[in-house]
Structure formats: C-alpha cells, structure tokens
Regions:
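N-terminal beta1-alpha1-beta2 submodule of the flavodoxin-like/Rossmannoid cofactor-binding fold
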Residues: 1-126, 190, 194-244
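Short, glycine-/small-residue-rich phosphate/pyrophosphate-handling segment
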Residues: 33, 125-179, 195-198
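Short alpha-helix boundary/capping motifs
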Residues: 74, 164, 182-187, 235
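A general structural signal for short secondary-structure boundary/capping elements
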Residues: 101-103, 145, 183-189
C-alpha cells in the first residue's frame, strides 16, 4: 500500500475533473476584483494538474432574485440562473468566492446561495439530491474581520444543500483594522501572506483529493439518503416510535 505521506502529485490523476469558481465580487468586469487575485492562486494549482476549470463573475449575469429554479416562470422578465445551474452540475468542484462587507458575505454571494438552494429539490438518477457526489469550498477577501464567520455561513449552506466539504475548505485574506489596502493593492502584503497562501493551497488540494475519491467511488452510496425512496414509503431502518 502506498504511504500517503510520501506520495507525490504524480500519484493521482485529476484530468477528468471539472471545477467551477464563482466570483461574487460586487464589481462588474473588467473592473479589478481583489477576490480574483485569490482565485487565481487556487485555480493555477488545479490547472497545473489538468483540471478543466471554468469561472464566472456572478454580477456580470442577470441572475434574478428568488428561490425557484427559473424565475421567468414567476414573473421575472429574464433569469440567467438556469444556464449557470447547468455549469454548476457539470462541475465536480464548486468554489464560492467573494468579498466581506460589514463582517458578512456580499449580497451577490447570498443571491448565488439562494439560487443554489432554489434547485436543491432536484434529484439525481439515484434519487439523491442533485448536489450529492460533489465537493465545495470558499475563498474570501476583505478588511478587518469576518473570514471565519463568512466561511462558516457559506460552507454550512453548501453542505446543507448536499455538497461534501473536505477538511480546511476555506481560505481568505483580511487587512488590518480600519481603512487600508485591499488584497491586490501595492503594499498590502496579501499575495505574500504565508497563512493565506498555505490555507489556499491546502483547500485546493483537499478539494482535489475528495473530488477524486468521490468520483472513483461513484459518488455517495445511494442508500438511506434517497428522497425518492423516502417519498415512496421506505424508511431505511428508521424506528417509528408509534409501533414500539
């Protein structure tokens, strides 16, 4: 058996994996996004190992507000989400990325999570929720405080929807308290910060490893977690106290 502590990157293949980074910056393209700087660090690791990486800046798309899969069926004149959702389902790895404002996630981040939730009732071929068998993480940038709070919110939301979260699946950078330079600004120290660089690297590799494991295993085993079977009356050994 291979000792995992001595294995190198050539020990695994990732060239059949797909990753999607969603940048939830408030800035439309082509305005510079500090979050993009952190995305580029993580993305370069994945691409170096053959992962097919897609990326989108959510604010560039006409994503309607709501909690239905297609909001044009609920009064909105247009909705870019159905097309984005197809990209989400095509990805083995999802990384939600965004800025911190007032110690919290951006409004764009919250909208993307709401729309992911809008599709959470969709089932896969095994009768599980559609996000099963996929992994997720998050990257955050900002000033002063809020990285752990924001990561907690994002990662909880994603696991609740069905994503599998690996160890240390978040990374971020924040500046000193008070007004000051952001991640990509000259003199910020962000790109040189060892703590941020380490966590970004660990997050990226843990996403790769867990995505590899799930893909090789055919996803999460389909027993005890199938909504279609539960609705049909199967209770998977759940003891009904009324019959005791």
């Amino acid at each position: 058996m291979t000792d995992p502590t001595s294995a190198g990157p050539d020990q695994w293949r990732f060239d059949d994996l797909h990753a999607l980074y969603v940048n939830c910056t408030l800035k439309r393209s082509p305005e510079r996004s500090h979050t993009q700087g952190l995305i580029d660090r993580s993305r370069s690791i994945m691409e170096r190992h053959g992962v097919a990486v897609a990326e989108l800046r959510a604010v560039d798309h006409d994503i309607a507000t709501g909690v239905w899969p297609d909001m044009t069926e609920h009064g909105w004149p247009s909705d870019a989400w159905p097309a984005i959702y197809r990209q989400v389902l095509a990805a083995d790895i999802l990384v939600l990325c965004g800025p911190i404002w007032l110690g919290d996630n951006s409004s764009v981040t919250k909208r993307v999570i709401e729309r992911l939730y809008a599709c959470s009732s969709v089932l896969n071929e095994a009768g599980q929720y559609a996000y099963y068998g996929r992994v997720a993480g998050c990257l955050l940038t900002g000033n002063e405080d809020g990285v752990k709070h924001c990561a907690m919110n994002v990662l909880y939301s994603l696991q609740h929807l069905g994503y599998t979260i690996p160890p240390q699946a978040d990374a971020g950078w924040i500046g000193e308290a008070g007004p000051g330079p952001s991640y990509l600004d000259p003199g910020s120290g962000g790109p040189q910060n060892d703590f941020t660089n380490r966590n970004t690297t660990f997050m990226t590799w843990n996403l790769l490893h867990l995505a590899r494991m799930l893909k090789d295993a055919g996803g999460i085993p389909a027993y005890g977690n199938q909504r279609s079977e539960w609705d049909a009356g199967c209770r998977f050994d759940f003891a009904n106290p009324e019959y005791r």
